[in-house]
Amino acid sequence: MLYKGDTLYLDWLEDGIAELVFDAPGSVNKLDTATVASLGQALEVLEKQHDLKGLLLRSNKAAFIVGADITEFLSLFLVPEEQLSQWLHFANSVFNRLEDLPVPTLAAVNGYALGGGCECVLATDYRLATPDLRIGLPETKLGIMPGFGGSVRLPRMLGADSALEIIAAGKDVGAEHALKIGLVDGVVKQEKLIEGAIAVLRQAITGDLDWRAKRQPKLEPLKLSKIEAAMSFTIAKGMVAQTAGKHYPAPMTAVKTIEAAARFGREEALNLENKSFVPLAHTNEARALVGIFLNDQYVKGKAKKLTKDIETPKQAAVLGAGIMGGGIAYQSAWKGVPVIMKDINDKSLNLGMTEAAKLLNKQLERGKIDGLKLAGVISTIHPTLDYAGFDRVDAVVEAVVENPKVKKAVLAETEQKVRPETVLASNTSTIPIGELASALERPENFCGMHFFNPVHRMPLVEIIRGEKSSDETIAKVVAWASKMGKTPIVVNDCPGFFVNRVLFPYFAGFSQLLRDGADFRKVDKVMEKQFGWPMGPAYLLDVVGIDTAHHAQAVMAAGFPQRMQKEYRDAIDALFDASRFGQKNGLGFWRYKEDSKGKPKKEEDAAVDDLLASVSQTKRDFSDDEIIARMMIPMINEVVRCLEEGIIASPAEADMALVYGLGFPPFHGGAFRWLDTQGSAKYLDMAQQYQHLGPLYEVPEGLRNKARHNEPYYPPVEPARPVGSLKTA
């Protein structure tokens, strides 16, 4: 053994070939600060070996290196800029030493090589991969850019266009594509990986392969003519401006850095990467996006822990077909859980099957599946008008009309047709689970399972624990949702649960703005372009359905009369009374026509202004800041109340529910991350300017306490240790 660290070791393999093996405690390898330091120490030993002829890098895990240790990011990002820059210089000196070894080097890559893992293998001369490879640089999705030389080496290896596509979009690619673009040199089966790697190294050692020529382009300026450079970087900047926009600075910074570094060799180019990385790491966007990643891990870990002793349903059923039922049936079948789809009429069943078939055909068109797979999935969705087969069902979700009487009747009837241990769930969006459970003989086997539309796209499923729901029932439904590829978050019961409970105060803020003379078009524009929502409130209401929102508004008002009972006729009432139900009938705040792809395209409709005039004061202009404050304060206050009342268990779960269920702008990180970034005291000062608008604008006492004591909602993060100690970690 030449060297042994906590996360990697170095040993002789054969005939002057050494192997450097990543083998961290736990299930995966991460390129954390300790591993970078250990890699430097291993290279120090290696540089003294006069008999060294070649070096093989490999992993003892199912994945090569899954990336940097993102749990370290928040503390690293708090380190002063100069100190972070010094540590990056140190880390890059380690990878440069790997790249500068006077012998051929090869990385044998299995499974994942992402972020720092990818940057590590870019420093070797050759790369062999297994068919399960996923390799790429996802840093821009975290609000940063590659910092270990990825933005320097990748363009010089692949050419500007392929590298820009991977880096700017934060992409990873599979083995076949990686081979095609030159990111790996060969793909071999796992059992042949080491044998193949040694064979390549031997060829390089004997001179049959020119490893020096392979290495040289990574040390030089990017080989691009002025015209080629202008085309590549102009197109890339245009694409990034269109897709990322101003709220996500990392992709544009990465492209501009690669452009600026193109005319330099490795050292100068790495300095430019360093100078771009450090300011990005100190942005609120990076902290928010890293926070989302960590919260996602927390939420998924919690679901995994909850279901570790639970068997996933092997046969499921959906009550109520149509678009929603068909979407749920598709998602279950697509992920391997066969489903019976029951309705009371053929028309709805046909609609549900058509929806499932449409979604499968899209997968076929994209090349994700073949005809055989499509037929196999669709055959596991069984449409029926009766309860045949329900005696074999492990889990049922009801997705009928949002009417408590109908839902109770359907659930009570179904309970008599299934086994005593079968779990029942309702896809209600607002009706309290306790109310629906009152119709059942076994309420302990019942809970809420709230999907979001469109089911196949929206990651969140709210699992609602009723007063009598058993732990086993919750765990079984969480297991089913996880199997469907969704992110389940357990919340406690109340009208609207968590997501809709906090959404309708936001809509109430919108209604009050329109009542006071705001133009809905400007409100939409400000909330989309300035705050960052994917849709403004008017557009969102049209997509949700004005009729659906009108009904839900009444349910929420009954549940929370003190705050949500309005004393005036609002825009939603006016549109509902005029049968303008939104996209579903082509008329809402906007008029909708199908575009060339058959998707609804919104257009202005002067008639809506006349309708809204009856529920609005004289038009007046509001500043962007005032619009954002009046829209967001009711939502933020309600989110805080839900945490204080135990409806949602933690800030992390609340923020992920908002991001995954409502599209809360990820660069803000969620409501609690946004609050922590603003500071509770600053938020309180802002909110108090609007408390005259009514109870929705009154800040909860818990938040006032946070402001008084300057306390954040997330645990405070301490800056990483000084860079000197990180080097020798």
UniProtKB/Swiss-Prot annotation:
<dbReference type="InterPro" id="IPR018376">
    <property type="entry name" value="Enoyl-CoA_hyd/isom_CS"/>
</dbReference>
<dbReference type="InterPro" id="IPR001753">
    <property type="entry name" value="Enoyl-CoA_hydra/iso"/>
</dbReference>
<keyword id="KW-0520">NAD</keyword>
<dbReference type="Pfam" id="PF02737">
    <property type="entry name" value="3HCDH_N"/>
</dbReference>
<feature type="binding site">
    <location>
        <position position="660"/>
    </location>
    <ligand>
        <name>substrate</name>
    </ligand>
</feature>
<dbReference type="InterPro" id="IPR050136">
    <property type="entry name" value="FA_oxidation_alpha_subunit"/>
</dbReference>
<feature type="binding site">
    <location>
        <position position="453"/>
    </location>
    <ligand>
        <name>NAD(+)</name>
    </ligand>
</feature>
<dbReference type="GO" id="GO:0016509">
    <property type="term" value="F:long-chain-3-hydroxyacyl-CoA dehydrogenase activity"/>
</dbReference>
<keyword id="KW-0443">Lipid metabolism</keyword>
<feature type="region of interest" description="Disordered">
    <location>
        <begin position="708"/>
        <end position="729"/>
    </location>
</feature>
<feature type="binding site">
    <location>
        <position position="296"/>
    </location>
    <ligand>
        <name>substrate</name>
    </ligand>
</feature>
<dbReference type="GO" id="GO:0004300">
    <property type="term" value="F:enoyl-CoA hydratase activity"/>
</dbReference>
<keyword id="KW-0442">Lipid degradation</keyword>
<feature type="site" description="Important for catalytic activity">
    <location>
        <position position="119"/>
    </location>
</feature>
<dbReference type="GO" id="GO:0008692">
    <property type="term" value="F:3-hydroxybutyryl-CoA epimerase activity"/>
</dbReference>
<dbReference type="InterPro" id="IPR006108">
    <property type="entry name" value="3HC_DH_C"/>
</dbReference>
<comment type="similarity">
    <text>In the C-terminal section; belongs to the 3-hydroxyacyl-CoA dehydrogenase family.</text>
</comment>
<comment type="subunit">
    <text>Heterotetramer of two alpha chains (FadB) and two beta chains (FadA).</text>
</comment>
<feature type="binding site">
    <location>
        <position position="343"/>
    </location>
    <ligand>
        <name>NAD(+)</name>
    </ligand>
</feature>
<feature type="binding site">
    <location>
        <position position="429"/>
    </location>
    <ligand>
        <name>NAD(+)</name>
    </ligand>
</feature>
<dbReference type="InterPro" id="IPR006176">
    <property type="entry name" value="3-OHacyl-CoA_DH_NAD-bd"/>
</dbReference>
<feature type="binding site">
    <location>
        <position position="500"/>
    </location>
    <ligand>
        <name>substrate</name>
    </ligand>
</feature>
<feature type="binding site">
    <location>
        <position position="324"/>
    </location>
    <ligand>
        <name>NAD(+)</name>
    </ligand>
</feature>
<dbReference type="Pfam" id="PF00725">
    <property type="entry name" value="3HCDH"/>
</dbReference>
<dbReference type="InterPro" id="IPR012799">
    <property type="entry name" value="FadB"/>
</dbReference>
<dbReference type="InterPro" id="IPR029045">
    <property type="entry name" value="ClpP/crotonase-like_dom_sf"/>
</dbReference>
<keyword id="KW-0276">Fatty acid metabolism</keyword>
<keyword id="KW-0560">Oxidoreductase</keyword>
<dbReference type="InterPro" id="IPR008927">
    <property type="entry name" value="6-PGluconate_DH-like_C_sf"/>
</dbReference>
<dbReference type="InterPro" id="IPR036291">
    <property type="entry name" value="NAD(P)-bd_dom_sf"/>
</dbReference>
<feature type="active site" description="For 3-hydroxyacyl-CoA dehydrogenase activity">
    <location>
        <position position="450"/>
    </location>
</feature>
<dbReference type="InterPro" id="IPR006180">
    <property type="entry name" value="3-OHacyl-CoA_DH_CS"/>
</dbReference>
<protein>
    <recommendedName>
        <fullName>Fatty acid oxidation complex subunit alpha</fullName>
        <ecNumber>4.2.1.17</ecNumber>
        <ecNumber>5.1.2.3</ecNumber>
        <ecNumber>5.3.3.8</ecNumber>
        <ecNumber>1.1.1.35</ecNumber>
    </recommendedName>
</protein>
<feature type="binding site">
    <location>
        <position position="407"/>
    </location>
    <ligand>
        <name>NAD(+)</name>
    </ligand>
</feature>
<dbReference type="GO" id="GO:0036125">
    <property type="term" value="C:fatty acid beta-oxidation multienzyme complex"/>
</dbReference>
<comment type="similarity">
    <text>In the N-terminal section; belongs to the enoyl-CoA hydratase/isomerase family.</text>
</comment>
<dbReference type="GO" id="GO:0004165">
    <property type="term" value="F:delta(3)-delta(2)-enoyl-CoA isomerase activity"/>
</dbReference>
<feature type="region of interest" description="3-hydroxyacyl-CoA dehydrogenase">
    <location>
        <begin position="311"/>
        <end position="729"/>
    </location>
</feature>
<dbReference type="GO" id="GO:0070403">
    <property type="term" value="F:NAD+ binding"/>
</dbReference>
<feature type="region of interest" description="Enoyl-CoA hydratase/isomerase">
    <location>
        <begin position="1"/>
        <end position="189"/>
    </location>
</feature>
<dbReference type="Pfam" id="PF00378">
    <property type="entry name" value="ECH_1"/>
</dbReference>
<keyword id="KW-0413">Isomerase</keyword>
